[in-house]
Amino acid sequence: TGTSYGIIAPLLHGVTSIVDEADFDAERWYRILAEQKVSVWYTAPTAIRMLMKAGAEIARKHAYPNLRFVASVGEPLNPEAVWWGKEVLGLPIHDNWWQTETGGIMIANTPAFDIKPGSMGRPLPGIEATIVKKDAEGKVSPVDTADTEGELALKRGWPSMLRGYLHNEERYRKCFAGEWYLTGDLARRDADGYFWFVGRADDVI
C-alpha cells in the first residue's frame, strides 16, 4: 500500500517525494518542511508525538506557507495530536485507515468533511464499510446500531482488493463471510458514519 500511494502515485503525477532516512531530529524535520517547500506531509502518529514532545518553539522557528495537507497512518492518532497540528502547523492532522490487503486507503478524514479528532474518518467514495457481529452459530451480520463495537468489514469488490495469500488459500477464504471482507480490526461507527478504532480481533499486526 505504501508503495502504491507513497512511491508510484507521486511518480505518475510528476510529484517530488522527500524521504529523510536519518535519525529523528525535530529541528531538521521542520527545516526540511520549510526549505523544501513541502506541500503534503504524510507521517506516523509516533513521529507526531515525538515532535509534540520536542516542543512547539522549535516548530515556530520556521514558516510553512506551502504546506496544505498533513496526514497520519499506521496506528490510531490521538485527538491531542490533531489539535497540536492545528495550533503549531496551522493545519489539522488527518488520520485514515487501510491494510496491506486493501491495496489503498479505505477510510479517511478527508478535506471535504469535518475532522472528528480520534476517528479514522469515513469510507472513501465507492467503499462500503460496516461493523459486523458473529452469532452463536458463527453467522456474520452487519450491525445497524451506532456506537456498537464489532469487527470492521468491507464489502468485497473494490478495485485493489487482495486476491490471495501466497501458499495459504485457507487463510484467504477465512477473510470473507459472504459479501464481506473481515479486516480483523475491532471498531465502532458513530451516528455520523465516522469509524473509530478499538483494537485487533486477533494477534496479527
Predicted regions: what is each one?
Residues 5, 10-12, 65, 124-126, ...:
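Short, solvent-exposed loop/turn segments at the edges of secondary structure
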Residues 3, 25-26:
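Short glycine/acidic-rich beta->alpha loop that forms part of the nucleotide-sugar donor binding site
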Residues 12-15, 30, 35-43, 52-116, ...:
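Gly/Ser/Thr-rich phosphate-binding loop
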Residues 144-147, 153-205:
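Conserved ATP-binding/catalytic segment of the ANL
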Residues 76, 115-167:
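Adenylate-forming AMP-binding core of the ANL superfamily, especially NRPS adenylation
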